[in-house]
């Protein structure tokens, strides 16, 4: 009998631990959802290309914040995001979407919102450069899934094959990645794109 009572006590402790873990999980899930909603409610510089779609589209003229690294973009410690985040945080510039990334060498671009693009008080730093870019024409493929090199490479291969069959435009620059979602979004909801700059075929 004593052994049975002791066993029952063990199960009660396991049950309490399970309940505590579930409460912790729910709080973490709520915190992530709240942070995600806050970061997802940003202005977007141009329309998204839906996952699985391939298209030509025109990107509007814009004001950029850009930083670079000597490392490949997919190196885990390239530090690109934090350089730009510290700049917008210290200058009270709203976060926008998307984030654009060159691969080798690693580069990252944040877009300025319309109000920030008109500010005269913003200055470059050794790590963050500012520039105005004209309207651009790109070939684009939409991707759903994690922001991995594998997904980027697969999307790029499909986009290049699609572009090679066209007779109206040709590649005119290096491909780059386009990321739409915050880090808090689950990988199966994340949307990204690969772009290749294009010009009309003469």
Model-flagged regions — what are they?
Residues 2-7:
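Extreme N-terminal basic, low-complexity initiation segments
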């Amino acid at each position: 009998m004593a052994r049975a009572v002791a066993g029952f006590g063990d199960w009660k402790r396991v049950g309490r631990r399970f309940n505590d873990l579930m409460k912790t999980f729910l709080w973490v899930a709520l915190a992530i959802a709240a942070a995600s909603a806050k970061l997802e409610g940003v202005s977007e510089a141009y329309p998204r290309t839906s996952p699985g779609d391939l298209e030509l589209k025109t990107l509007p003229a814009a004001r950029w914040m850009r930083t670079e690294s000597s490392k490949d973009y997919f190196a885990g410690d390239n530090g690109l995001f934090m350089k730009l985040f510290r700049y917008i945080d210290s200058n009270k510039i709203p976060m926008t979407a998307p984030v654009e990334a060159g691969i080798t060498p690693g580069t990252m671009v944040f877009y300025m919102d319309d109000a920030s693009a008109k500010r005269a008080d913003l200055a470059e730093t050794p790590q963050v450069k500012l520039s105005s870019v004209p309207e651009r024409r790109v070939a684009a493929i939409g991707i759903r899934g994690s922001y991995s090199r594998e997904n980027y490479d697969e999307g790029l291969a499909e986009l290049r094959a699609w572009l090679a069959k066209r007779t109206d435009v040709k590649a005119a620059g290096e491909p780059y990645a386009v990321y739409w979602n915050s880090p808090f979004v689950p990988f199966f909801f994340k949307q990204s794109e690969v772009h290749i700059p294009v010009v009309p075929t003469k």
